[in-house]
């Protein structure tokens, strides 16, 4: 059935102002973006673990979990094992042993060297980190052997000094003296002044 205007100048089909019935029927998107997608996909527990606030409105104590923390509950381990191939191996040795790469025995793959020879050279370079003069095992044994469960005041009586565990960053073997600060009467301390109790109180008030 057609619909015509009052002037009769034009005639249009019934669906002119609506939807063409010959076209496919429109289907709404599923699931609807305005629906509760967390409930639909069963993510309530995950959402609770990463929520910034608790259900009662209080601030959550734990930090939001990263992807690595999320998968810790799964069986198996998903941690990359450090190795030379992935570039994650040997990064901490320079920190622990204070080795300058230029002073370490270098193992280079030269022409004519077999794969086994190169592997042996790399092994010798790594084991050299734990041999004298890189490591003083006698000193380590003495210091670590004194770390027994006891009152802190007993450490010095047994010959233990906490400075023995410190790194000799300047390579001189001497202790660095800390600069003392003296108060000049102001609430702000200069490098040549020492903080007094009154100064600390002023800083707290400020």
From Swiss-Prot:
Gene Ontology BP annotations: regulation of transcription by RNA polymerase II
Subcellular location field: Nucleus
Principal location listed in the UniProt entry: nucleus
UniProt keyword annotations, A-Z: Activator, Nucleus, Transcription, Transcription regulation
Keyword Cell membrane carried by entry: no
InterPro entries, alphabetized: Mediator_Med19_fun (IPR013942)
Annotated segments matching region Disordered: 171-206
GO cellular component: core mediator complex; mediator complex
Biased composition (Polar residues): 183-195
Molecular function GO labels: transcription coregulator activity
Membership in a protein family: Belongs to the Mediator complex subunit 19 family.
Quaternary structure note: Component of the Mediator complex.
Stored PANTHER family: MEDIATOR OF RNA POLYMERASE II TRANSCRIPTION SUBUNIT 19 (PTHR28270:SF1)
Free-text function comment from the UniProt entry: Component of the Mediator complex, a coactivator involved in the regulated transcription of nearly all RNA polymerase II-dependent genes. Mediator functions as a bridge to convey information from gene-specific regulatory proteins to the basal RNA polymerase II transcription machinery. Mediator is recruited to promoters by direct interactions with regulatory proteins and serves as a scaffold for the assembly of a functional preinitiation complex with RNA polymerase II and the general transcription factors.
Protein name: Mediator of RNA polymerase II transcription subunit 19
Organism in which the protein naturally occurs: Kluyveromyces lactis (strain ATCC 8585 / CBS 2359 / DSM 70799 / NBRC 1267 / NRRL Y-1140 / WM37)
Lineage: Eukaryota, Fungi, Dikarya, Ascomycota, Saccharomycotina
